[in-house]
Amino acid sequence: KLLNKGNFNTMTYPSDNHRYFVNNFSRVNTTPESNLMNSDGTVTMKLETADLSALFETGYKFPETFKAKADDGITDLYGVIYKPFDFDENKKYPLLEYVYPGPQTEAVNKSFSVRMDRLDRMAQLGFIVITLGNRGGHPDRSKWYHNYGYGNLRDYGLADKKYVAEQLANRHDFIDINRVGIYGHSGGGFMSTAAILVYPDFFKVAYSQAGNHDNSMYNSWWSETHHGIMEETDDEG
């Protein structure tokens, strides 16, 4: 039974006797709130609503969520778009994709938090910044979605990143599809380098930080979990 209804990302903390729980909830484009609820889902007490007034006084604007299709034309992908706070729809902006392909998670924020600052700050330099999921990403989507990249950790998410950028440019005149960059850390660094090598005519710039570019030399527990065992043994083992 769903007790904390609403289209939010939530963090819950039950009491020791499980009669009550604290429900913290928000989306990337809503103010965080916290309620005390009882075990049947009734709000017992509204505890706190974050005060973002000082933030908005600086010109802050919430990011926007979007949905697009994967490169297969069927699978829905979800993402967030961050704009400059002085955004002008009559201008053309270069597009940056901040990526982390998974497979154990994705680089898409689901709730309002300070973790969004790295994307907001980049947008203030005059970019449209997006994050989005890709097939082979978060296991919460489905077993098929999560396993899509098994055995192919380099390429599995690239086509989706390119195709979604093209869809957004078709929707929004303010996106300059001729100026697309990609960047990320760790698996995102691995992906950004692969992206500019596979699609050099599309991705004009890539920034790679701490990329695991050769997974045969990376943490074996991670590589073998998501790629499979790459070692070959002879009759002597």
Residue spans for each PLM region:
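Serine-hydrolase catalytic core recognition
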Residues: 9-237
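Surface loop/turn motifs at the tips and blade-to-blade linkers of beta-strand repeat domains
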Residues: 3-7
